[in-house]
C-alpha cells in the first residue's frame, strides 16, 4: 500500500481513554517529587496535544525554579541512603522495574505513541524492549563492577572505590521520551545517584505514566520528575549549584547553553546533540541481487524510522555514481511502499511528527530544498489522512542534490533524505566528514577491508557497518565534533555517574623521616 492509497479506517489499539483502550491518561499531571504527586508551586499547567490528531488530551505542570528546588530537596534527602544501598539491592530494584515495564509493555507503548506520534509497532518492537533491556543491562553491570587495589610497596596500598556523584540533573528529548529517559536513569540509579529529571515539554505525559507504574519500587526521592518549559524549568535545573552533574539530549544550540551552566558550577556534563549522519553505499552492494542488497536498500530507507526524528537519522545518502540510478530506483520504490496511517494501527510504518512546531520546521525545509534546486524524487509534501487532518504528518521525502546545500548540512529532524553521488572511496570520505556533526554514520560494502578503512576514517562516534539504527545497551553511543560530549550506554556509562575515591593507606609504623 502506498502513502496515496491509505484508507481512513484503522484496525489496532483503541485511542487512550476510549472503550477497550489499554491506557487512560489523567486529565492533569502534577510533578513527581519525593514519591508524591506535587502540584506546581505557581499552580500553572500547560496543554499537551497528541500529534496523532492534534487534540489536547492532558495537561502537565508548568514548573518553575521553585518546583525544581522542591525536587532537589527531595533528591538530596534521598541521595545519602540510596548511595549507601548495596549494589545487590540497587540491581534488584532495576530488575523489578524492568519486569514491571515488561508486564505492562502494551500500555507503555500506546502511551508513548499517543504522546509522541510514532507508530505503535516501533514502540512495541523497539523503544520499550530496548528500555527494558537497558535496566537489566545496568543491573548486571553494577553487580559486576569492581574497585581497584594497587600495592605501592610492602606496607602501602592504594584502594580505589567507585562512589556516586550524589544528585544529578537530566533533561531528555521528545523523540524517544521513554527510551531516552531510561538511557539516563538506568546508569545513574545503578551508580547510586538520586535524579531530578525534566522531560521535553512536547512529550510530558508518557514518562509520567511510567512513574505511576514504578513509583512503589523506588525509595522516595530517588527519582523526581519535573515538567515544564526549557527556560522556566530546564535552565533552573541545569544551572543549579545543587546538582553534581547534568546530562542533556537535544539540539546543539541548547547544548552550548547547558555546557555554559555546567562550567559556571564546575560540574561534569554529558551532551548528546545533533547530527547529519552520512549513509554510504559502495558499488559492490549491487554485485548480487540477494538478501544483502535488500538489507542495504532498507538501510537507506531507515531515514524514515521514527519519522526521521532521530539524532543519528541517516539523512545524507552518499551513493557511488556507478550504481546510483539502479540503487535509487529500488530505494524510491521502497519509500513509496511505506504505509502512513494511524499510529495505533500495527500496520502503520510511519506516524506523526512530535509537534506542530516540528511539522512546520520540516515543511519549511521542503521549501528550502526546492529553492536550492534540489530534485524531489518522492514525497515533498504534508501527509493527509481522513479523520486525522489536524495530525502532524509528512510524506517521506528524498531529494537529489549536492553536499553544500542546506538540506545536506542542517539538521531537519524529519523524514527527509538528501542524496548525492561520489566517485571513489576518497571522495566518499571527504563528503562524509564535510559536516559540523559527528554522531553517527552508516557504511555499506561487501569489502571488509574497505569497511574498516572507512569506519576508522569517518569522524563519528558510531559507524554502523552493514546495518543501521541498532541500539544495544552494551555499545557505547556518543558524538564527535558538535554532536556532543561523553557517551551513553555501555558499562563505561557508570563512570560518568561516579567519582573515584582513593584511599592511600600506610600500614607501616615508621615515620617518613622528613621532619
Swiss-Prot record:
Belongs to the aldehyde dehydrogenase family. It catalyses: an aldehyde + NAD(+) + H2O = a carboxylate + NADH + 2 H(+). The keyword NAD applies. NAD(+) binds at residues 228-234. The active site is at residues 272, 311. It is an enzyme of class 1 (oxidoreductase). Keywords: NAD, Oxidoreductase. This is Aldehyde dehydrogenase. PROSITE patterns: ALDEHYDE_DEHYDR_CYS, ALDEHYDE_DEHYDR_GLU. Residues 1-20 are annotated as: Disordered. It comes from Deinococcus radiodurans (strain ATCC 13939 / DSM 20539 / JCM 16871 / CCUG 27074 / LMG 4051 / NBRC 15346 / NCIMB 9279 / VKM B-1422 / R1).
Amino acid at each position: 500500500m502506498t502513502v496515496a492509497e491509505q484508507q481512513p479506517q484503522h484496525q489496532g489499539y483503541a485511542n487512550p481513554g476510549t472503550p477497550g483502550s489499554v491506557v487512560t491518561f489523567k486529565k492533569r499531571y502534577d510533578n513527581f517529587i519525593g514519591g508524591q504527586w506535587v502540584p506546581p508551586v505557581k499552580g500553572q499547567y500547560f496543554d499537551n496535544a497528541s500529534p496523532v490528531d492534534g487534540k489536547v488530551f492532558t495537561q502537565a505542570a508548568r514548573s518553575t525554579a521553585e518546583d525544581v528546588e522542591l525536587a532537589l530537596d527531595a533528591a538530596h534527602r534521598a541521595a545519602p541512603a540510596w548511595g549507601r544501598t548495596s549494589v545487590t539491592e540497587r540491581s534488584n530494584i532495576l530488575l523489578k522495574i524492568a519486569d514491571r515495564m515488561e508486564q505492562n509493555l502494551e500500555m507503555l507503548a500506546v502511551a508513548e505513541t499517543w504522546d509522541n506520534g510514532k507508530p505503535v509497532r516501533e514502540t512495541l518492537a523497539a523503544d520499550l524492549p530496548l528500555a527494558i533491556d537497558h535496566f537489566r543491562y545496568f543491573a548486571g553491570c553494577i553487580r559486576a563492577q569492581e574497585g581497584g587495589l594497587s600495592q605501592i610497596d610492602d606496607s602501602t596500598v592504594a584502594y580505589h572505590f567507585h562512589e556516586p556523584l550524589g544528585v544529578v540533573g537530566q533533561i531528555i528529548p521528545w523523540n524517544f521520551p521513554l527510551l531516552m529517559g531510561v538511557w539516563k536513569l538506568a546508569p545513574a540509579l545503578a551508580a547510586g545517584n538520586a535524579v531530578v529529571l525534566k522531560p521535553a515539554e512536547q512529550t510530558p505525559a508518557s514518562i509520567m505514566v511510567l512513574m505511576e507504574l514504578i513509583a512503589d519500587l523506588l525509595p522516595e526521592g530517588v527519582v523526581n520528575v519535573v515538567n515544564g518549559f526549557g527556560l522556566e524549568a530546564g535552565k533552573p535545573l541545569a544551572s543549579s549549584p545543587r546538582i553534581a552533574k547534568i546530562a542533556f539530549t537535544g539540539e546543539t544550540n541548547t547544548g552550548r547553553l547547558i555546557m555554559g551552566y555546567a562550567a559556571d558550577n564546575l560540574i561534569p556534563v554529558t551532551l548528546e546533540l545533533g547530527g547529519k549522519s552520512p549513509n554510504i553505499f559502495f558499488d559492490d552492494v549491487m554485485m548480487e541481487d540477494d538478501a544483502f542488497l535488500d538489507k542495504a536498500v532498507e538501510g537507506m530507507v531507515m531515514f524514515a524510522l521514527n519519522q526521521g526524528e532521530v539524532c543519528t537519522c541517516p539523512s545524507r545518502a552518499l551513493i557511488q555514481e556507478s550504481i546510483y540510478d539502479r540503487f535509487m530506483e529500488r530505494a524510491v520504490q521502497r519509500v513509496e511502499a511505506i504505509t502512513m496511517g494511524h499510529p495505533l494501527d500495527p500496520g502503520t510504518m510511519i506516524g506523526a511528527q512530535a509537534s506542530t512546531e516540528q511539522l512546520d520546521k520540516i515543511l519549511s525545509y521542503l521549501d528550502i530544498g526546492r529553492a536550492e534546486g534540489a530534485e524531489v524524487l518522492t514525497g515533498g509534501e504534508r501527509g493527509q489522512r481522513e479523520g486525522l487532518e489536524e495530525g502532524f504528518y509528512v510524506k517521506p521525502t528524498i531529494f537529489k542534490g549536492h553536499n553544500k546545500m542546506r538540506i545536506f548540512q542542517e539538521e531537519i529532524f524529519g523524514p527527509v533524505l538528501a542524496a548525492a553521488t561520489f566517485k571513489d572511496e576518497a571522495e566518499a570520505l571527504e563528503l562524509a566528514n564535510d559536516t559540523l556533526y559527528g554522531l553517527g554514520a552508516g557504511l555499506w560494502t561487501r569489502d571488509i577491508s574497505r569497511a574498516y578503512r572507512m569506519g576508522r576514517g569517518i569522524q563519528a562516534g558510531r559507524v554502523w557497518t552493514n546495518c543501521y539504527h541498532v541500539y544495544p545497551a552494551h555499545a557505547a553511543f556518543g558524538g564527535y565534533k558538535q554532536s556532543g560530549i561523553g557517551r551513553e550506554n555501555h558499562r563505561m556509562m557508570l563512570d560518568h555517574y561516579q567519582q573515584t575515591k582513593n584511599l592511600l593507606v600506610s600500614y607501616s609504623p615508621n615515620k617518613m623521616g622528613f621532619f
